[in-house]
Amino acid sequence: MRVKVRGFASFREVMGREVQIELSDGSRMRDLLEALCSNHDGLREALFRPRGELREEVTLLWKGHGTDPSESMEIVLEDGDEVAILPPFSGG
């Protein structure tokens, strides 16, 4: 199956604006992020803490909607899904 991933701000600098990733059927969000990390230097450190947990300041959008950080890594992806990776928001 093929999943489209869009990177924003600092993630765009590391992985580019948009990439297509081929995954096995039944793959989860964690599998997608691991595949991305293996292809883009510096992405693992930006996404994950040293013990492998997704950094809480990273926002994942799946099918245009925010994901629950406690459950996002176990989302089962489908062919044609779109995932966006956003860095922390700031402003005043």
Where are these regions (language model features)?
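Ubiquitin-like/PB1-type beta-grasp interaction modules and other compact soluble beta-rich domains
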Residues: M1-G91
